[in-house]
Design a protein with these regions (language model features):
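Conserved Radical SAM active-site core
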Residues: 12, 16-22, 35, 53-117, ...
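Conserved, mostly hydrophobic/aromatic
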Residues: 39, 91, 143
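Non-cysteine beta-strand/loop elements that form the S-adenosyl-L-methionine
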Residues: 141-149
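Residues at the C-termini of beta-strands that transition into short coil/loop
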Residues: 25, 119, 147, 171
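Short pre-active-site segment immediately N-terminal to redox-active cysteine/selenocysteine motifs
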Residues: 43-47
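N-terminal [4Fe-4S]-dependent radical SAM core
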Residues: 1-40, 53-59, 179, 186-192
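P-loop/Walker A phosphate-binding loop and immediately adjacent motor/lid segment at beta-alpha junctions
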Residues: 95-110, 153-198
Length: 198
């Protein structure tokens, strides 16, 4: 499989991010558990072969993240039927300049909402990363980690594309200092039926 692999701390959000997003999708059911609002940031350095979202690789793609968009995200997230926010891309952890203030605001104003994020970093790589990435990680509930590996593609997997990726309970993992898999993981027929419906 081909993708880029950084040395610890090599890719810095403050050097790469242009403060841009590819898309914002409110009220969807595909990017994690429950009804979610999904923010797709611009820019990714991993460049996984077979990536379904190649259009997000450029840090100059999309549109600027604005205060107006943030207000819309907060208003949508405040709806009682919305479970939480999902961060995707692109690579969320290379866009900490826009995501850290947003996530801090959510934790302060809407603490009952959960936050999911996808990342190309593995948990083990993340533990060696820069303080901004670790701060963002500390405020996330669920992390889907690891590069997409086309050779391990599996449509039966819940919320991920290849079997090397994990759905990690971040808070339990940080407390126990070891990877703790999300306790609602449900790979198999039910996931396959969901994928077919999409």
């Amino acid at each position: 499989m081909t993708w880029n692999t950084p040395k610890p701390g090599e890719w810095k959000s403050e050097e790469l991010s242009q403060g841009r997003i590819i898309d914002y999708k409110a009220f969807n059911f595909v990017d994690g558990e429950g009804v979610r609002n999904s923010l797709y940031v611009a820019g990714c350095m991993f460049h996984c072969e077979g990536c379904y979202n190649v259009a997000t690789w450029s840090f100059n793609a999309g549109i600027p993240y604005t205060p107006e968009l943030e207000e819309q995200i907060m208003a949508d997230l405040a709806q009682p039927y919305v479970q939480g926010l999902t961060l995707l891309g692109g690579e969320p952890f290379l866009n900490t300049g826009i995501l850290l203030p947003l996530v801090k605001r959510i934790r302060k104003e809407l603490p009952e909402k959960d936050i999911w994020s996808w990342t190309g970093y593995t948990w083990e790589e993340m533990m060696l990363e820069t303080p901004d990435k670790l701060e963002l990680l500390s405020m996330i509930d669920i992390l889907v980690d690891g590069r997409y590996d086309k050779s391990k593609r599996n449509l039966m997997l819940q919320f991920r594309g290849s079997s090397n990726q994990r759905i990690i309970d971040v808070q339990k993992s940080l407390q126990s200092e070891q990877v703790m898999i999300w306790d609602k993981l449900n790979d198999g027929k039910e996931s396959y039926e969901q994928v077919k419906r999409e």
